[in-house]
From Swiss-Prot:
<keyword id="KW-0150">Chloroplast</keyword>
<keyword id="KW-0602">Photosynthesis</keyword>
<keyword id="KW-0472">Membrane</keyword>
<keyword id="KW-0812">Transmembrane</keyword>
<keyword id="KW-0934">Plastid</keyword>
<keyword id="KW-0793">Thylakoid</keyword>
<comment type="subunit">
    <text>The 4 large subunits of the cytochrome b6-f complex are cytochrome b6, subunit IV (17 kDa polypeptide, PetD), cytochrome f and the Rieske protein, while the 4 small subunits are PetG, PetL, PetM and PetN. The complex functions as a dimer.</text>
</comment>
<keyword id="KW-0249">Electron transport</keyword>
<dbReference type="InterPro" id="IPR036143">
    <property type="entry name" value="Cytochr_b6-f_cplx_su8_sf"/>
</dbReference>
<dbReference type="GO" id="GO:0045158">
    <property type="term" value="F:electron transporter, transferring electrons within cytochrome b6/f complex of photosystem II activity"/>
</dbReference>
<protein>
    <recommendedName>
        <fullName>Cytochrome b6-f complex subunit 8</fullName>
    </recommendedName>
</protein>
<dbReference type="Pfam" id="PF03742">
    <property type="entry name" value="PetN"/>
</dbReference>
<dbReference type="GO" id="GO:0017004">
    <property type="term" value="P:cytochrome complex assembly"/>
</dbReference>
<comment type="similarity">
    <text>Belongs to the PetN family.</text>
</comment>
<keyword id="KW-0813">Transport</keyword>
<feature type="transmembrane region" description="Helical">
    <location>
        <begin position="5"/>
        <end position="25"/>
    </location>
</feature>
<dbReference type="GO" id="GO:0009535">
    <property type="term" value="C:chloroplast thylakoid membrane"/>
</dbReference>
Amino acid sequence: MNISLVDLTWACLMVSFTVSLALVVWARNGF
């Protein structure tokens, strides 16, 4: 299994974006 640095960086960006988006929605719902 060969994962390039670009793929790993992109995966981290997608995870960070998803988590931040979920936190925004969660905060808007009043926790």
